Amino acid sequence: MTQENQNPPPEQEDVAADPQVNEAAASEPAAVKTPEQEIADLNQQIGELQDNFLRAKAEGENIRRRAVEDIAKAHKFAIESFAEHLVPVTDSLYAALSTDAGDAKAFKEGLEITLKQLLSAFEKGRMTEINPAVGDKFDPHHHQAIASVPSEQDPNTVVSVLQRGYTVADRVLRPALVTVSAPK
């Protein structure tokens, strides 16, 4: 036999050497359950687990339902802030229409102020203009070429802007309509 087999592990030596542990183990009666008691205990555990499962399932469904409601509310009211910024622009336009001023210069100044209000509302709504300068390189992600015209400019550069484009939070809402220079 080897040395390991002859010597018991230290834990076993301590338990065997301690007479109080042996007496305590001998004095406690072994709790023996009848099969009916074990079945009853297991059925109780099954009932508790089923109850916990149903509660967790209901909680998950409630969380999902609340998330769907929150998303619906977010979609419904997402434009509210932007709309609040447009109300003063509408007020200015109604005021301009209600005046009988025959002065074209004053009317133009009023329109310029209203345009500034509108651009301010766009900025607050994270909406920016796409207005390429003449000679800028054509960008198909932000520009839509309507025509290709002969020009002294480099090929595929903007010759004119027919309609400004817009982005909302770096997403193109409408590309700028441009004419581009034709290749030579």
UniProtKB/Swiss-Prot annotation:
Family matches, as SUPFAM superfamilies: Coiled-coil domain of nucleotide exchange factor GrpE, Head domain of nucleotide exchange factor GrpE
Keyword Chaperone tagged: yes
The entry's keywords: Chaperone, Cytoplasm, Stress response
Keyword Cytoplasm set for record: yes
Location of the protein in the cell: Cytoplasm
One cellular component (GO) term of this entry: cytosol
Domain of life, per lineage: Bacteria
GO BP, one annotated term: protein folding
Main location: cytoplasm
GO MF term set: adenyl-nucleotide exchange factor activity; protein homodimerization activity; protein-folding chaperone binding; unfolded protein binding
Pfam families: GrpE (PF01025)
InterPro entries in UniProt: GrpE, GrpE_coiled_coil, GrpE_head
Region feature (Disordered): 1-35
UniProt record similarity statement: Belongs to the GrpE family.
Family annotation (HAMAP family): GrpE
Cited function: Participates actively in the response to hyperosmotic and heat shock by preventing the aggregation of stress-denatured proteins, in association with DnaK and GrpE. It is the nucleotide exchange factor for DnaK and may function as a thermosensor. Unfolded proteins bind initially to DnaJ; upon interaction with the DnaJ-bound protein, DnaK hydrolyzes its bound ATP, resulting in the formation of a stable complex. GrpE releases ADP from DnaK; ATP binding to DnaK triggers the release of the substrate protein, thus completing the reaction cycle.
Oligomeric and partner information: Homodimer.
Record protein name field: Protein GrpE
